Amino acid sequence: MPPFLGDREDKVRGKKVYGRDFNTRDLGWEGACRHVYLLRVTFADRKYLGLDDARLLEVFTLLGVQPPEIIQATDLHARAFTAPYRQKDSSGRPRTVVHPAQGLALDDKSVVPDFFGLYWLTPPGGYADNIGQPVAILLFRESNDLRKFATWNREPSRHEGSPLLRFDASSRVEWQQDIQRLVNPLLGARAFNEEAIYGATHFIRSQVKDNEFSAQGHKDHDPDALGPDVDPAKRAINLQANKAREAIRRSVSEEGMTVLRRTFFSQSIDPMFMELETGLAFLTRDDECKRVMRIAAGTQSPRKDREGVETLTALWPEGEAPRVELKTYPIGGGFGGRDLSTFSMYLALAAFFCDGPVRLAFDRYEQFLCGIKRHAAVLQNVLAYGLKDPQDPKSGYVLHSLDSTIYMDGGGVLNLTKPVVQLCALHAAGPYRFTHNAISGYGISTDGAPSGSMRGFGIPQAAFAIESMIDEVASAVGADPIAFRREKLLTTNDVDVSGFELRHRLDTERICELAQREPLWTGREAKRAEYAARGNGLVKYGVGFACAMQAIGTSEDAVFAEVSVSSTGEVTVRSTAIEMGQGSETSLAIATRPLLGREASRVVLGVLGRFDHDTIQLNKAPYAPGQPRNTPKLDNTMSASVTAFFHIHAVEEAARVVFDHGLKPCAADIWGDVPEDARWEDGKLVAPGRPPIPMEELAARAHARAKEDGLCTGAIVHTYYRNAYACSEYTLGGTTRLRYIDGLAVLHGGDAEDVRGYQHVTRVDVPYDGVANDAKHHIRSVYASAGHLIAVTVNTRSGVIDVVDAVTLLDAGDVHHQRILEGQVEGGFAMGLGMTLFENVPPAPVGVDGRLNLHRYPVPRATHMPPSGVQLRLLPIPEGQQILRSGPPIRKKGIAEAVMTTVMPAIANAVAHATGARLGVLPLTPARVLEGLKP
């Protein structure tokens, strides 16, 4: 088996790979391990009064377990964790208070991480942020004792008679009922008081005469914020936006447009990764007898997790704050569910109260209860369309405007709701060219578990709504649904709903062109007629299509990468990337092959401390003259389909430095020069008329000359992307070259394991034309286009939908690894299938009652997939072209999210084609199908 697939061999052989596999002995940590259980509130709409200590002791005795040590909110204060307690009043607005139990004013050391929420532990006398928020940390000596108590605690009887937690029933508030009305589609959506809103996003773009307006230059405009307390300059802009929105609405009737009004609901779902959140922590001392908080856990966001724990260690009352070391493990699935999770914070909190190591390991019940979820969403859309020429029925149709109001359930703790709402709003109009748009999105605070950056980041919710509506409009005007789409697609140089130009390559039109020629599409009517002619119409057949342009990355993306070559030619890659089943380890290993002639034999992921070393360290600060170590961002969380476009680019840039300034000079010594057409074949550098040079020989020569001649045997690079790749000139070995990186350190021989051997290379500058001046206002700039053709059968008696055929059409660019790509396609389809037909986390309080597990949460199985599998159609980039308008010649796109975004609307459109029923509430359960089939 090739070395870069070794991780998969370890998994199938049952070796220790994931965080759950390891114990403290594996890490060499001394002392008895305590097992952590988080005791959680069962209500968030009334004051929590405290634990019933007598009842708790009675339960421990009943179960025959040794009573654990119990840490509560007051214990945090006693250990100087004096973070502010902020409570929700009856309106739901958070407000900062000093809790009476503290008896002290807040001081400068009070810190609550932005992504953590309002409480660490709910204090007596306070309202919890959400059902399931911890009120106490229990430290058990035996893991079996913990499991006994956890099993007892989730039984319904715990709520009856003598519950463990005491609440003040007279303090019940009703603010959350409005939220339940929002997320319950059967009761309908409605507007809410601003006090219940985490944040809002607006995209108003009007071309109405005398009321022109665009979000370009007015990123934070709010057409509803017109009060006297608003800054006058902002109020003036907001007033313009408000007038523009009203002008758009008036123009619909004035121009005689046809209006389609629809409300769509997409449910909350669980990421359902197989490897549950697990970790170990130990507050101990290092070799220099300094305190260190060691954490070993799986995470998608190692830097953010470490920074979060550092907010705790900064409160350490006894001398110098402990240093934080974070060791990461492959996580066996993330899907956004481990992105800015609070797990590491609670793990560290427990370690502060124990003189030995601690272990926190969620079971499936706990993961369902408190893990990050996909946002439930309501989209109220008003789509206006009409003939280009009202006098000519054959003139074709124009999309006049989209007026959309979006509500997303953010749960009780603010995770990444604001950017998710923003991206959902940005994609509300899909890949289509509307003349005007008035889009508003709101993140809502509820009693439920926190919602975050689950796969798709708000775009699947938007795609379900707009693709269903476009399909319905095409049907209403008697047009082929794909042909109708093709006429109205955004292309490169168009503007998005925020008014910004789409500068880079966009291939949605080619996706639709390919789909229109597919046999599954061209034969759909004949197949539907065939089904209609048999079985008295009991089973109906239909084919649906949906497409999307899926944003890649975040609004700004930064990564570190290191490539080093040993004296024997072995290649090592280190990266801030995280392996979570998407194949990053393999992808980065083979990324070195084009430049170094072989794949890396060793890949180290989740690297943090090494890239923060003094010899390499960059400063997180805006670019500025005379500040060659400044960079606006250090690195990303592992999300947003970043491997292909961002991490591989960084590895390639590091490998290029090693080749240009390490191996190439050695080849020139042998050949006299290195021609442009030199290339690698079977591990040897070859060129016409020149003897092949083995990689091992070049590596040995580079190491031998490294110290004396300054040849590079290793390189660490940092890249930064914000609408364009930052670039600068670097001088090495007397040669100056422009590179699409903003940080560089090189190794001149020696042991690459010792990061102290690296030397920082000062960049010349970061040209402002390399990072567009308006980039900070440009929400997204690179997109992967995708589409699905899906055939279904609908049993009109049972309401059961079966997917019988499927084609994924994908704009992935150059394929880096075919099997990994195919795995993403199949996995994305399965996830989309689950969201469409099966999965559902009910709104609070039912969805957070602590008893949700796979017996109550159906997921798709292999038998639910199309019998012949998911067919894949790839859209290659023509030779000589690239994704970016300017900059590095990147030809690969991240597609992990694009492959699932359009599954939901494609199935819904297939059901409509089969039955005529347009369904706007997910999941499409048999009961909802039968309801939709009623006359």
Q: What are these regions, as identified by a protein language model?
A:
Residues 307, 332-355, 359-363, 369, ...:
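Thiamine diphosphate
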Residues 81-86, 149-152, 276, 306-308, ...:
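Short acidic, glycine/serine/threonine-rich loops at helix termini
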Residues 181-313, 489-568, 771-773, 788, ...:
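Helix-loop-helix junctions that connect adjacent transmembrane helices in secondary transporters/permeases
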Residues 170, 325-345, 368-372, 407-417, ...:
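FAD-binding core of FAD-dependent oxidoreductases
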Residues 5, 65-66, 73-76, 99-112, ...:
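C-terminal catalytic domains of large/alpha subunits in multi-subunit enzymes
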Residues 141, 355-410, 543, 646-678:
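Phosphate/diphosphate-binding loops
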Residues 1-202, 206:
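Flexible, low-hydrophobicity surface segments
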Residues 380-402, 563, 789-808:
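Active-site and channel-lining beta-strand-loop segments
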